Amino acid sequence: MENNLKTCPKEDGDFVSDKIKFKIEEEDDDGIPPDSLERMDFKSEQEDMKQTDSGGERAGLGGTGCSCKPPGKYLSAESEDDYGALFSQYSSTLYDVAMEAVTQSLLSSRNMSSRKKSPAWKHFFISPRDSTKAICMYCVKEFSRGKNEKDLSTSCLMRHVRRAHPTVLIQENGSVSAVSSFPSPSLLLPPQPADAGDLSTILSPIKLVQKVASKIPSPDRITEESVSVVSSEEISSDMSVSEKCGREEALVGSSPHLPALHYDEPAENLAEKSLPLPKSTSGSRRRSAVWKHFYLSPLDNSKAVCIHCMNEFSRGKNGKDLGTSCLIRHMWRAHRAIVLQENGGTGIPPLYSTPPTLLPSLLPPEGELSSVSSSPVKPVRESPSASSSPDRLTEDLQSHLNPGDGLMEDVAAFSSSDDIGEASASSPEKQQADGLSPRLFESGAIFQQNKKVMKRLKSEVWHHFSLAPMDSLKAECRYCGCAISRGKKGDVGTSCLMRHLYRRHPEVVGSQKGFLGASLANSPYATLASAESSSSKLTDLPTVVTKNNQVMFPVNSKKTSKLWNHFSICSADSTKVVCLHCGRTISRGKKPTNLGTSCLLRHLQRFHSNVLKTEVSETARPSSPDTRVPRGTELSGASSFDDTNEKFYDSHPVAKKITSLIAEMIALDLQPYSFVDNVGFNRLLEYLKPQYSLPAPSYFSRTAIPGMYDNVKQIIMSHLKEAESGVIHFTSGIWMSNQTREYLTLTAHWVSFESPARPRCDDHHCSALLDVSQVDCDYSGNSIQKQLECWWEAWVTSTGLQVGITVTDNASIGKTLNEGEHSSVQCFSHTVNLIVSEAIKSQRMVQNLLSLARKICERVHRSPKAKEKLAELQREYALPQHHLIQDVPSKWSTSFHMLERLIEQKRAINEMSVECNFRELISCDQWEVMQSVCRALKPFEAASREMSTQMSTLSQVIPMVHILNRKVEMLFEETMGIDTMLRSLKEAMVSRLSATLHDPRYVFATLLDPRYKASLFTEEEAEQYKQDLIRELELMNSTSEDVAASHRCDAGSPSKDSAAEENLWSLVAKVKKKDPREKLPEAMVLAYLEEEVLEHSCDPLTYWNLKKASWPGLSALAVRFLGCPPSIVPSEKLFNTPTENGSLGQSRLMMEHFEKLIFLKVNLPLIYFQY
């Protein structure tokens, strides 16, 4: 080391030999004392070097004699000056980074891990998946440090930080204001040395700079190419260039600011510490004057956005070959007036002398204009969430500008327009935050030159609108949130925005004194608004200009017509309305875009003329002298009651409608009647409709709810009479409320092909809750049967309908009904639950696995640290951002979903359990068993879900049983470790579902389903079931004839002679039609079975609706069986209510009302609120 300090070049040969000697001794650094390295103070060295540069040349460098010098300083003073001028352009921040890297490189020679001592590890961490890769802490990108684990480097890491995150280096060194912009290329070339000595024969400094500059990409190239991923080719190429630069600079000289750089660091790191040189001004393709009107798209650097029309244009397909021809063409075609005005009719202005700049995305927090800067070779990447709203940019500018700034005028001019976000105040270059100094705007190159152009963006209408975040061609109103189109691409404006203000928000237009003023009363928008208001038949109101020159215009909206006091929009079809007086549905037109109110007025004139007369008389009634009507309220176009402070009378249509809606809310949400006395609810009503008076709670409990209950009950009775074939099926069960009270429920199911009360839809299944009654805890089957028979008598048999099949999940109810005269079947979903629950309990290993999964999920739910770690691992491994599911042990479906979620998050669960020190760890064998359990339970969960839909029928049970049996057989070969569970599944299915395969009700339903027919039976079974179906059809026909004959006999008893005569002629009729009637049922069944089987997605009820005319008897028989649901689950879903209020059920009166509230809660949506 000491020998190296004494070495100095004497001539060319000696210099080369000395350099080789330096290289050899550099590898053997055992002689370097570690204590001296730790005490190195690079800041003091920097200050000493600065003093040396200002005071004079260092002694001993100009001669040829040998003296003791620091390593690396072996050039003449002229060479030092030449390269001192070159390296003086570097910022102090980059110098600090370079010196810190040198320090870490020297310290790495000690017996410690070298990879953790590089300054790059302040910004990176080692990838947990691959130790040869590192991950950036800011953008979470992964970079390779080399292929061989013994030869890794951090060159690419520091290169990424300098290119993609330069602000981090600025903040890290604490000298933000010292960072200077890179000078022009002409200033970078050092002056030709006066006496270069023999070194000029090796390589001149100018040639060196030119050669280095040719190897380094331009700032434009750096901006365009992606820096997120560094390929191996780029790394190798950068290393080769760096090595060349290191050799040439070693031959020529070194900077006085980097005394030990060539000695202590490898040559490849030298190039990383140096900055690339920009191209010349004439060669930059981004310095066209057209960039005054465009800025780079934040999503795609190959596209530019026009600041005038916000349209996006491509600058070329190849990211390395971009141009501005299309931008110039767009300006000349779409904005020719701006170009001519800007250049006095000469076309596009000449090129900039320097590249255009951008406004800084993040201004310094202290408000100092010169506190932030960036080198042009380290462009500050534009933030994706950069302000695009009209307010945000100007607020940032004004908050950071000093009052004395010369540019405050321009920024203030821009702050008057909230639409400045359209332009984004951007240029194609990446943002350079050199404060808001005159250099930032290139002596006003952007704002000063474009001041006239940007005046068009100062429309005052942007005080009330903001650009839509999802579509730049639309603007959002700040008052109503409506998204309004500003035009098509290439032709946008603010006319539609002003029109919206005049029509929807006239009070805003008139309330702002400085907004548009009275001078715009003669504008086209004012004329249009006034013409529209005068052309309205129901609101013939003139435009008013107040004495404060505030223009007020009437609101022209579909909701301002007085007719809307008597109608409400139908919830099922927005093109129809419902009359509040008679409940009739009236169409407003066929096209949703062209709806009117003429039909509504005709309906009132035809059926409710007295309402119009009453309204006219109320309007004509003079108001008291003390009552003052606001001018703006008169112009709002609302009803006469909205124009005054008078309260609605009780029979007013609006008051009746509001009261009805409040009663609906009480029923739908199971609210107590005292809810109407709540202060917040009353304040809301007072604000929304001050004219409305809220009735007392007793009105709702004694009048509104009982009246609504009676109306809904009558409507359901009328719907039941429309049932096809006159058969009603039922689902019944015991429902337990949240207060542990048990209720017996009865829900009706029927098929209706044509119902005027229901909107047209493909679903012909109808259902309604008939009754709810509380039962004692020690109820018996006989008491339940008596209660059901009472309900059937009240709802079904009294109206001439027939009681069909009853589906229940209660074994006691089913047994009692089967022993009597009623038909009952078990719920399919409940049977599947019993089968799966028994199978899970049959194997101890499966139970232990479920217990382990529950503990893990419970621990994660209770531990915030585990939740946070799980979310972090999900992001790291790109797993779905899902929470773990905690199951309910009594419901196997929740356990299945819990295991599925654990398998989905398997990788994260394993790592989280280790890092959070969980006692419960899932082994590999347990993961395999868990997957087998999920594979076994999945078909049963799918079957239960399929059979629980609103459109499922009894005909799907036999096909589903065959599918599950086949699936269980296959699971023996596909799974491992759960054979006991699979055998239990198979045995339980045989014991609980085998009888279903031969039940006549299920067999007839399957035969009459055009999707299955006899395809699931053997030939012998199919032939037998076909004959049974024919006999069932004949029996139904004979029963219907007897019923028809009894009705005819009840009409009146004729005389004996006439009766005998009728009997004679009836005998003749029977003789004529004897043979055909005997063959009719068989012919229908054979013709039906000969047709092809339909796809599974087809609706069988729609099929029988089409065949109703061809096979009326067979269609009626099919509806009898296909109208029955296979599961009680759809009915149970109707009772998913919020937590009941404690006041309900405390007395017998409240319990009766609770049953009525449940009845209304379930049935109001089923009848589409038409009552």
From Swiss-Prot:
Tell me which residues bind Zn(2+) 2.
Answer: 306, 309, 330, 335
Q: In what tissue types does this protein appear? A: Expressed in testis, heart, lung, and weakly expressed in brain, liver, muscle, placenta and small intestine. Expressed in the retina, found in the cone photoreceptors, Mueller cells, cone pedicles and in the innermost retinal layer.
Localization (cell): Nucleus; Cytoplasm; Photoreceptor inner segment
Q: Give the record's GO CC terms.
A: chromatin; cytoplasm; nucleoplasm; nucleus; photoreceptor inner segment
**Ranges for region Disordered:** 25-62, 362-405, 614-640
Q: What is its main location?
A: nucleus
Where does the record put the Glycyl lysine isopeptide (Lys-Gly) (interchain with G-Cter in SUMO2) cross-link?
43, 489
Residues noted as binding Zn(2+) 1 in the record, renumbered to the chain: 136, 139, 160, 165
Q: Which residues carry this modification: Phosphoserine?
A: 624
Can you state the subunit structure given in the record? Homodimer; via C-terminus. Interacts with MYH9. Interacts with SAFB/SAFB1.
Q: According to its UniProt entry, what is the function of this protein?
A: Transcriptional regulator that binds to poly-guanine tracts in gene promoters and activates transcription. Able to bind single- and double-stranded DNA and RNA.
Could you identify this protein by its name? Zinc finger BED domain-containing protein 4
The gene for this chain is ZBED4
